[in-house]
Amino acid sequence: MSQDFINTDNHTSNLSSNNLYTNINAGNSIMSEELAVKDNSNSTVASDNTERTPCDAENGSIYTTGRSVVSDNAGNQDKGKNFPNGESSSASGKSENSHADDENDGSTENNSKLGQPSFSYDSEIFQLCQHYLTTKNHQGLALVARQKGLPPFLRFKIWPILLKHHPFVVNPFIEPDNEVNNENDTNTEEDLKSDIKRDLLKYIHRLNYTNLIDLNNASPEEQEVFKILESSILKFVKKWGKIMKYDHALTWIALGLAEWFPPIPNTSWVLVGRDFPSSKTSCIKNLFHDYSNYINNVPNLNEYLEDLVNDKEIINMSFRDVYERLVLVLLHAPEEKIKNKSKDLLGPKKINRKILPINGGTIEERVSFFIYCFRKLLPELSQYFQEEQILNKFGSHDDEWLIWWLKWCGSKVWSRLDRGRIWDLIFGWRLQNFKKSNSYYVEKLNLSDNLINKLGPDNFWSVSKDNDDSTIENYKKSSSFKDLINELNINESSNSNSPTSNSPSNSSINEDLLPPSPLSSSSFSSSNIAPADEFNIPFSKLDPHVELLFVTLALLKSKENTLMELDQHEIRQFLSRLPTKSINISNKYKHFKPQESDMNNNIISNDSRNNHKIDFMDNIINESGELWRKWLWSEMIDDN
């Protein structure tokens, strides 16, 4: 048997139909052209009674843009004062006096001590992002999203643009559910509404498990938010019901979107997410509140954000339209003709590890590929999981966490902070149009060599094109992975000026797998340096769901020591509610705290003077690229 194929008999035979949708009786999904081009549709108008708002547990008040609205029990709060972006005088004081325990891992129990989330951003890239947003340059926004992530407080404007132009929305395909045509299914629209409402209430209970909230007694804004969510989910299921039936994960996707995109038009109200204390008496908050330190450090950013909230020119999509496109991206699967070719030649229970990284696969194929990579890249943790009978089989209540991670892209189980950064990566995924020259993209994106250097190469780069033939000849590789590497590097092959090394390394993997950084003086001679307009733009190489798979492996690697101290039940519980990767540094480690932001490197931080945090998500995404290259290298060696 060829080593290119993974036998999935041991992994997918026990997959529960409750968790995974197979591709039986699959058909082509059809979407009207308006989905890819339509900007606005029917939108719900916010309640007129804006003065009756829920209480913010931190400050005693909750804010609309540029104005504070004092709650009934505000008591000692300043009344009638105007604060930029709704920030009260007590907000910064609370943030600066917050400290975490020495062993704080960012879990929900410790989030009350986290203060504002960790966030730092290069000012030049931020200005570039603003320019792309103003000019509606979706290619530029996608580039920033996948390379550096988006400023969190701009996602509400940028995500709709990225989703509108995403390749999976322009050419959608959702893997059909083989149970969707079940004749015994007698669920009515009222039953569907009841299911959606029940799942929405689970979110509220998850936030306020010590203080249950009755939506009938909630503020008008909260009621309206959940009403919009319910109608958006219902509309999606009714439209796409012939392809897939309702799953409660669809509600959690909508809730995840509402944590960054305000459901009520022209407001900044978003759901709080589980990163906040459970004592909160409100389910909504001002999107900009968490990033006030950063916003106040950028001149005129307050006014800019206020204008964006009320803007209808850049993008004007309703929540339901953004939600529909979001689901199409997260649940995209390869078209049937691609899968049929593989099945006709290889058999239904074999997946080609050469093809899947580029073309993607069904959720069953991705789960099998994940387990294969997991055992190869993290052998000790994989062995411990086997001893604890984790990932040995799939049932309705066993290892459902992996389905939430891989199929539903972290909905429900990941922190909103971590999920937001990973969704940036997925939404920014773009392949290069080979009909366009590289200089066209440089000019179109208005990039200097300095900005290209700051953005860096694609995170999932592989061996350089000039190294392909000599490397594979040196190690006598099979045509399988030579073809894979050639396909991964077709971008470089279209550009004769790509600056790469001319010979493989004889000593180390890192030297052999050189990143295609255009400004690395050590990787090429001065005679090979291309003009600035010929530098390579970092386009995506792997399928976005395969990128997510390696991000998942990086997350597991980051928690390997913790996981190996837990038993079976604790592991599943931990992975079903993964702590945020943004943690706080306590007084014990203050001597490791960096000094004030270096103005020379143009980095602006959201940290306050006495409250420094670390956001590990960029490290996680970088590590996922390293794991990809480690896997690719090991496959090349094994094929020898």
Swiss-Prot record:
Rab-GAP TBC domain: which residues?
A: 149-430
Q: Name one GO cellular component term.
A: cytoplasm
Keywords carried by this UniProt record:
Cytoplasm
Q: Which superkingdom does the taxonomy of this entry point to?
A: Eukaryota
* TM helices/strands, residue ranges: none
Q: For the region Disordered, what residue ranges are annotated?
A: 39-116, 492-520
Location (main, coarse) = cytoplasm
Q: Where is the composition biased (Polar residues)?
A: 39-48, 61-76, 107-116
Where, per UniProt, does this protein localize?
Answer: Cytoplasm
The protein here is known as: Oxidant-induced cell-cycle arrest protein 5
Which organism's genome codes for this protein? Answer: Debaryomyces hansenii (strain ATCC 36239 / CBS 767 / BCRC 21394 / JCM 1990 / NBRC 0083 / IGC 2968)
